[in-house]
Regions:
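Alpha-helical transmembrane-bundle signature of multi-pass membrane transport and export proteins
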Residues: 1-423
């Protein structure tokens, strides 16, 4: 008797709603991610330190509440978290164009909105990553992640160019208003999901500290997850510093117009789209395990193009670099996220994802703050070279691990990867 093939996700109603909602939401995130730094630089005259501080506050919540957020999300219905999260972010972001119209916009307000959106995003992202296994079967998880990543990369391709055009036409404040509309639409799509999660049993709750410890223990006790967390955390520490300074660097040191910057980012993001559609083939070619260190090395090395753009032709250098970075990051993420989703028991998914987010996103506000301080003190280009050196080092935990000898990744908790797990 043969096992029937799983139904196509194209015909899966609930996955389609999640997919459409996620796609609209990430388009909105691209708009605000492009427009808010421009607003700070062009309308409020922000310097390197202020740009670093803004980026720090955007991700600070992952460091401060990332761990308890996972335990809380495991106690709530994830669909509700997603719907309310998008609505909350939409309302917060709407205060920026409102303040601009009233001529009362300040850097202080940008900081407050960054913190508020960051707090909501912590809960939203943990619920979002934990929700897919609720809707699809285990063997469909990789396919679902691939489709979600393809949409996200499509948004990254079209988003910056579209945002640049909107900024040119409407200005950065009204472009952020478009983001609010996108997030409202996202909440509408997700609210149409028919699947009803089983309500967590309040009687089964344990002390918050115990649940947090359980999530951390799951991640840190697995030898492969430890390596992946170390690599991702170091990479995020470096890249957050780079990206905190990137818009200021592009507009001042490289003298790029905002439309040129948007096109460079959009064309570079084609690499991520190619990564989303080729990740399965690449994993089969080199092996699931090997795909992770190879993608990490490629994306880390490609970061060299950012400071090199100050001495080489800027546009082609950044374009090639962004193509390679985007491809490597997406292939890496699809492989490692699918691995941990397959490995983790469903009741632990929220805490596991929150623990990993805390460990790998927690360094981001630190990197952004250090990047801003160093950029103000030592200059943009020397700071970027230092951050890129750290990006190269970040691949070592997975490069010097059993992953480089593994074609297949473990799918069971008792298949803890060591040398015996290599194939």
């Amino acid at each position: 008797m043969t096992t029937p093939r799983p139904a196509s996700l194209w015909r899966h109603h609930d996955f389609r709603q999640l997919w459409m909602g996620d796609t609209v939401s990430v388009f909105g995130a691209q708009f605000v991610g492009f427009a808010m730094p421009l607003m700070a630089v062009q309308l409020l005259g922000a310097n390197a330190f202020q740009m670093g501080l803004l980026a720090t506050l955007e991700s600070l919540a992952f460091l401060l509440i990332g761990l308890p957020a996972g335990a809380w999300v495991d106690r709530w219905r994830k669909r509700t978290v997603l719907v309310l999260g998008d609505l909350g972010r939409a309302l917060l972001l709407l205060t920026l164009p409102a303040a601009w119209l009233l001529d009362v916009l300040t850097m202080g307000q940008l900081y407050v909105v960054a913190v508020g959106v960051g707090v909501i995003t912590v809960f939203f992202d943990v619920a979002n990553q934990s929700y897919l296994p609720e809707l699809v079967e285990g063997e469909q998880i990789s396919d679902g992640n691939g489709k979600l990543q393809a949409s996200q990369q499509t948004a990254m391709v079209a988003g910056p160019a579209a945002a640049a055009a909107m900024v040119r036409l409407l200005g950065s404040p009204l472009t952020i208003a478009v983001t609010s509309v996108c997030m409202g639409l996202s909440s509408l799509f997700v609210s149409r999901i028919r699947h009803r999660e089983q309500a967590p049993d309040p009687a089964a709750r344990r002390p918050l500290v115990t649940e947090i410890r359980e999530g951390l223990s799951f991640v840190l006790s697995h030898p492969l997850l430890r390596r992946i967390v170390a690599c991702t955390g170091l990479s995020n520490l470096a890249s957050s510093g780079v990206f905190a300074l990137f818009v200021l660097y592009a507009l001042t040191t490289l003298d790029l117009a905002e439309t040129t910057l948007g096109l460079v980012l959009s064309l570079g993001a084609v690499g991520g789209l190619l990564g989303a559609v080729s990740s399965g083939w690449f994993g089969r070619w080199v092996g699931e395990g090997r795909a992770i260190p190879l993608a990490a090395v490629l994306s880390g090395t490609a970061m060299l193009t950012v400071p090199l753009a100050s001495v080489l032709p800027a546009v082609p250098t950044l374009l090639v670099g962004n193509l390679l970075i985007s491809w490597g990051v997406v292939v890496y993420n699809i492989a490692q996220v699918s691995f941990r989703q397959r490995l983790c028991p469903k009741p632990l998914l929220g805490r596991m994802n929150a623990s990993i987010r805390f460990l790998v996103w927690g360094p981001m506000p630190i990197g952004a703050f250090l990047g801003g301080v160093a950029g103000q003190r030592f200059g943009l280009v020397p700071t970027l070279w230092g951050l890129v050196a750290l990006s190269l080092i970040s691949a070592l935990p997975v490069l010097l691990s059993p992953l480089v000898r593994m074609r297949e990744l473990p799918r069971e908790l008792d298949a803890l990867a060591g040398d015996a797990g290599a194939r």
